[in-house]
């Protein structure tokens, strides 16, 4: 989860988020090198007293600044496409959960079970227990097994919403009349917080998401108690 005054990303808790963090560092380093080079060239141009008034063109330099950006774009595009295909790939999910966005709460349905569904509302500030987080706690958490691929089917009943859990690298639009899907797999147990990430009305800020990732044995106990 996020910490006060945090400047970086949340700790990665899924393979996809780890890949995204590596890609971010890779791209940021390229941007840093380009910015440094441009700043150096500008400084040289502003401080040098040398001029060459008879130069009309420079084929060598033009060739360099045509080929070099192409190489840089390839170095950015290849890992980006790799992660994009990884995010879309779903290999034999062990569980499927359908989530529907409403103004302003989420509803969940475990499609592998006959009667396992519930609504998830934000806990009001006056009802919070010691240690709970304001605007992030819900009355019904989404309990899922850790270290197992889970398919999320995401849609909306009314307006555009977006189902997002940053530490798992998830953000999928919930669109009325359309069913989007995403894959999640947590590498460790814990509570993972998210929020609706699409402005959807006056109470947009009051649509938190809480995933509780537990070992498979504990998930089976929980699912049995909910049926």
Curated annotation (Swiss-Prot):
Residues 46-59 are mitochondrial matrix. Disulfide bonds: none annotated. Cu cation A2 binds at residues 196, 198, 200, 204. Cu cation A1 binds at residues 161, 196, 200, 207. It comes from the Eukaryota. It holds the Pfam family COX2. GO terms for biological process: ATP synthesis coupled electron transport. Its EC number is 7.1.1.9. Residues 1-14, 88-227 are mitochondrial intermembrane. Belongs to the cytochrome c oxidase subunit 2 family. Component of the cytochrome c oxidase, the last enzyme in the mitochondrial electron transport chain which drives oxidative phosphorylation. The respiratory chain contains 3 multisubunit complexes succinate dehydrogenase (complex II, CII), ubiquinol-cytochrome c oxidoreductase (cytochrome b-c1 complex, complex III, CIII) and cytochrome c oxidase (complex IV, CIV), that cooperate to transfer electrons derived from NADH and succinate to molecular oxygen, creating an electrochemical gradient over the inner membrane that drives transmembrane transport and the ATP synthase. This is Cytochrome c oxidase subunit 2. It comes from Cavia aperea. The lineage of its organism: Eukaryota, Metazoa, Chordata, Craniata, Vertebrata. The gene is MT-CO2.
């Amino acid at each position: 989860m996020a910490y006060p005054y945090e400047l970086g990303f949340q700790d990665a808790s899924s393979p996809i988020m780890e890949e995204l963090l590596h890609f971010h560092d890779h791209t940021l380093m390229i941007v840093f090198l380009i910015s440094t080079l441009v700043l150096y060239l500008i400084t040289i141009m502003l401080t040098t007293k040398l001029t060459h008034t008879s130069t009309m063109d420079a084929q060598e330099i033009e060739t360099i600044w045509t080929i070099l950006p192409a190489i840089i774009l390839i170095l950015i595009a290849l890992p980006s496409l790799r992660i994009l295909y990884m995010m879309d790939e779903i290999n034999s999910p062990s569980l499927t959960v359908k989530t529907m966005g409403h103004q302003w709460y989420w509803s969940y349905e475990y499609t592998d079970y006959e009667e396992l569904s519930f609504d998830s509302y934000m806990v009001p500030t006056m009802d919070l227990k010691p240690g709970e987080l304001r605007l992030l706690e819900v009355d019904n958490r989404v309990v899922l097994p850790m270290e197992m691929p889970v398919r999320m089917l995401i849609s909306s009943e009314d307006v555009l919403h977006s189902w997002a859990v940053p530490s798992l690298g998830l953000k999928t639009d919930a669109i009325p009349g359309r069913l989007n899907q995403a894959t999640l797999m947590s590498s460790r147990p814990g509570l993972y917080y998210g929020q609706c990430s699409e402005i959807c009305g006056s109470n947009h800020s009051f649509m938190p998401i809480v995933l509780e990732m537990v070992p498979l044995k504990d998930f089976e106990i929980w699912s049995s108690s909910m049926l």
